[in-house]
Each structure stands twice: as C-alpha cells, then as structure tokens.
C-alpha cells in the first residue's frame, strides 16, 4: 500500500511538472520607453498558422498553455504600434515600435511622453513640425522643459546639469553649439534623467539631485556629416553681408563640429561659448580679481535690439570614444567683437537727509573684445574606475572706451591669460570608494585705466588719471575622499588643501586653506537623509589673519513613487571676502568711483533653509514645482557709501550688520500634444530687508517684488502662436517711506501662418514701464518675416523694428536707489537670409 501511495505522488508531480513546462510566458513592452503594454494581442504561430492567442495583463505579461515546438513564432499587435513577429525563446520580451496609421480616417499614435523610473522620455517626432529649424525650436515645445533666451535649458524650473547627444558631451556645457545647429528633422527623442549620476562607479552609491538631458538622433542622421550655410544680406547704413557655416557629425563613438561666423546684425556670437555647467568634477581653480569697472553692454531685454556690433567667431570641437569606452576630446575657439552702445542714466539714492541724492550719466561706449581658448580632455567612465585629465588655456583682451557728456573719456584695458591642468580619479573597491582630485593653475593680467578730459586745460589736469596693475596668480588644490557603505548608510570623509599666491601692486598675498568635510547619509526607495558638517581653516599671510570657518547642512527628502516628492534642507556657512576686496588698499575703478579696502578680513555667516515639492504626471504631460526659501546673512563689515558732487566713494568699515530674504515660487507646465498645445505658468514673490551705510549713518531698507509669467505655445502644422508674458511689481522702502509700486510688464507674441511651404510670421514685444516721477513708457517693437522652405534650402526676408523705434526707457529699484535708464535701439532694417542644408 505504501508503494502505491508513493507511486501516485510521483505521478501527480510529473504531470504538474509537464503542465508547468508547457506554459509559454513573456512580456510586451514599448521599445522606446520600456513601459509595459496592457491588452496587447499575442498569437502563437506554428507552421504559419495561429494555434492560440491571449491578451497581456496590466503589467504587459502573458502566458500561453501550449507545449513549445521548434520553429514556433509570436505575432503581436497593439493599436498605435507596428505588427511584430519574433521566434519563441527563453526570454520572450517583445518590444513593439510605435507607428502612426490610418484607421477609418483617424490617426492613432503612441504616447508622446512616457516615464521609466527617474527618466522622462519625450518622443520628439510628436512635437516637431516642418517649420522647426533646429533642436532648440523643438525643445521649447516640451511640457516641463523651458529654453531661456541665452540658451539655458531648464526642467520644472531647475537648470539641467548635463547635456549630451547620443550619450556624449561634445559641447562641455556650451548648449548653444548643439541646440542651434542640430536640425529639427534629425532628432528622435529626448531623455530627461532626474537624480542624474553620470559616473558609473558611483551609481546606486552616491545619490544626486542633478538633472541630465540626452538627445537621441534618428538612425538616418546618426554618424552622417552635414553642413549648414546661412549667408545673409542686411540693408542698413551701410548695407553689408554676413552669416555662418557649420559642419557637424554626431555618432555614438565619434562626434565633431566646426563653426565659422561673421555678424553685424546684433547677434551675440559669444553665446555659442556660454558655459551653463562645469563639465568636469575637479578641485576648484582660482579666479583673477578685476580691479577696474570695465564697461559692458547693458541690456534690460533682447540684446539683439541694442547691440551695434561687428563680430566674428570660429570654433572646432572633436570627441572620440574608443573600444574601452574611454573618451578623448579637443576644443578650440576664437572670437572677436566690436560693440557700440549709447545709454543715459539717472540714479537717485536715499542716503539720509530730507532730499534724494541724484547723479546722471550720458555715455557712448565702444567695446573691443578678443578671446581665444583651447581645451583637451581624456575621460574614463568604467564600472569601477572614473577619471579625467584636462589641460586648458585661454587668453583674452577687452578694451572699453567710454565717452561721457562734458568731454570726459575713459579707457579700461584688461588683457589676461589663464593656464590650468587638472586630474581626478575615482575607484570602487568593494564597499569603499576612493577619490582624489588635483589641479594647478596660473593666471596673468595687466589691467590699465586711463582717464582724460577734453573740456579745457585746467579740468584736463584735474581729471586726467592713469593707473596700471600687473597681476600674477598661482594656485593649486588637492582633495582626497573615502566613502564607505554600511547597508543603506554611507559615510564619506573628505580632506582638501589649497595654496593661492596673488602678486599685485608689488605685494604678495598668500592664502593657505584646508577643509575637513565628513558626511553621513541614508538612502532607500522612500527616504534620503544627509548630514555633512565641515570646517575650513584659512590663513591670509599678508593680512596676518587666521580664521576658522564652520559649515554644514541637513537634507531630508521623501519620495512618493514616481509622481511626487518633497525635500527640506537647512544650510549654514561662514566665508571671507575675496582678493578683490582686500588685496589693494585704495583704487579708482572708473571715472567717478573710488574704493577704500578694509584693514581687516571681512567675514560673513549665512543661514539658508529651503523647502521644495515636486509633482508630475508624464502620461498627462503635467509637471509642477513649488519652492520657498529664506536666508539670513550676518556680516562683520559694511560698505559705507558717500556721494559728493556726483562722485562715489566706498569705504569698508568694521560694523556688524544683517540682512534677510524670503522667496517663494510656483511653476506649472501642461501639454496637450494631440492638439499641439503647451502652457506654462510661473509665479514668484520676494521680500528682503537690510541696511545701507552712508557717512556713518545707518539706513534700513526693505524691498518687495512679485512676478507672474504665463506662456502659451500652440503649434499645429498650419500655424503657430507663441505668447510669453512677464508681469512684475516691485517697491522699496528706505527709512520710513515706501516708494510707489512700479508695474512693469513685457508681452511677446509671435503668430506664424503656414501656407504649404511658406511661413508668414509677425512678432511683437510690448514693454510697459512705469517711470519714476513721469508718465509710463510703452514701447512696441515688431518684426515681420516670410520664410520659403524647400527641400534643402530655406529662404527668408525679414523687416526688423517695423515702427523704427529709437529709444527704450525703464525704471528699477534697489534697496536704497531708484534708477532710470534710456537705451538707443537699432533702426529699421531689412534682412535677406538663405540657409543651405547639405
């Protein structure tokens, strides 16, 4: 009987095993985002015939109770995706490709925005139209993503910290080189990575709040060399020609870009070289102080309307990735600018007494700027080893010539040269991470200031002045850190040492400093908590000062899945003034301003707290962010300001002071890609109070400002409406009296009508500015443009500044000042431009 029972049990087990082995299981997912596809139809084909079919569950899984035979095939269909066949194997993960198709005259498409853990994936083909010329035109339409006027890219109002194309960083933080020149028709998708950790050796070990963006190109554009030529003719006084040429090749292993540009239309060619993040994680380098107030282009709005320029720029960037994933990159650039501008200013200060102190200025400037830079980087990013070796150098010369009403002329020349070499290495050894960083840099500058008067011989003698300061700055910094993991807890201990030697005015200023920074943090799926106290010891040898500066922070983050999270942090930091404040005892920085340095090293303490809440629903294309932060600043020194006969005199005094600041902001972005609509709304408010010193008197001030910024982009294939508004209100109080509230706003509207291959565009900007003690100023600037799009050519004719506006005027507040400025604009111009895409 016992043998019969055992035999029966074995028989049941064998049948169960056979039943289990006959079930064929698998998963159906989106090939772009990896998201599971529910209710997809899965058919099992044998010898070309369907023998069984099922539908996937909510997680994209399926199971077919059929014994597998050699040669069996899956056939999967799902609305919005291409039909897919593949052999039955051990994995059975079936990836479907999105496809638009016609079904009873209804166009069906896959979702344009998806989410995979901390990665938001935008299908750029769903946002691109034939009107779009470059990548920047496409990015501005993405919900949750904003592109600033200078080219900075933000996600939910926060600047991204890494921008790559095909996983490689060719631009090294210079976004405009790529976003202005990658063609819109060549892009496939954009991936926004929250908590971006680009260092493989630190992934799942060191958590970050950085945001990265990666652009993927279409297969037809990857590794292809393309050239873009953009010549133009500008009917001006005098009429002239200009333009640029770009050669680019983007791949996963090799990337290059070469640009040549010449412009007199008001464009800022230097924005191609604007750095929006530090591409290398190195020990810090030093910065050469500036002793004279070199003039610069003043621009309260689009600088292209104000810049009278003759500019040229050249650059080359080359990056390769070898079989071991090591990268080698080389970059070189040169730019030259000659810029002219005419401005007027009236400044009123509350410096005690019964009346305001007022100064005026009428100036015409000519800026001559030359800049050259070269950079080489060897980069390793392996699973257990990360490292960079960088050598770079740059040289520049800025000449600012300013003529003031009354015959006074000022010239400030600031040539400088900077050389640096840096290395960093990170190794993972089990639960330990060892990292060291070293840098050595040298800086040379020879600033010269000349002031002359043409009014008469007596005043020329009185006003003529010349000063020259030769600077040599040597700096080196080294740091070592050790990170060890204890389950979900991490301990990180860092040590840094720096030496800085500044020789100026025939005196050596040496700074020795060491920093100890232990950190403890906890990380799991729901919580992140960190605590990092630290201590810095500084020794200023020439000033004879030794200071012990504590710092530290506490950070708490709570994560609610992939939809929302909040974080709270509080930071305390003590710091000292830089060389610019203490190394030269007395100097004249421009024609009417003198600064007296302190005979001590000023010290400041800052307490900052921040609360932030994020919420997103990518499937509904909704993104939001709320922030509120407050800070208090304590200083051991104050700047005493005295104005006499229009001359500014600043003297550092030993006096304890404090200032407070509170800021709150809300950002919301919602997209409806089915109707090609994106909306944004940003709200912010700021309150600050502090103290200003004048002739020994203390003046308490307060400042209040709030801003409302709506945005709407509606861009179907037949037209585009682009609206941006910025409504700001601010007021200040010095002593007992509040100023009147200034309501300043800017409204931008662009309307494009598309008729086949022709785009008719009309754009306008309305500036409303309330002027102190005078009627409000309203300035309307408008441009009209016609673009004819052919297969590889774009031909456009634009009439700029339609109403031929001559000037623009505005008033702004500070804590104790009211400033009214007037700017002269570029005249009406006709531009003819052709773009060849080869």
Residue ranges and their predicted role:
Residues 235-239, 302-310, 362-370, 411-417, ...:
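Short sequence motifs at beta-strands and strand-loop junctions characteristic
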Residues 705-729, 735-838:
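Conserved C-terminal beta-signal and adjacent last beta-strands/turns
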Residues 27-37:
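Structural motif
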Residues 311, 319-337, 365-543, 550-552, ...:
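Face-selective signature of the C-terminal outer-membrane beta-barrel domain
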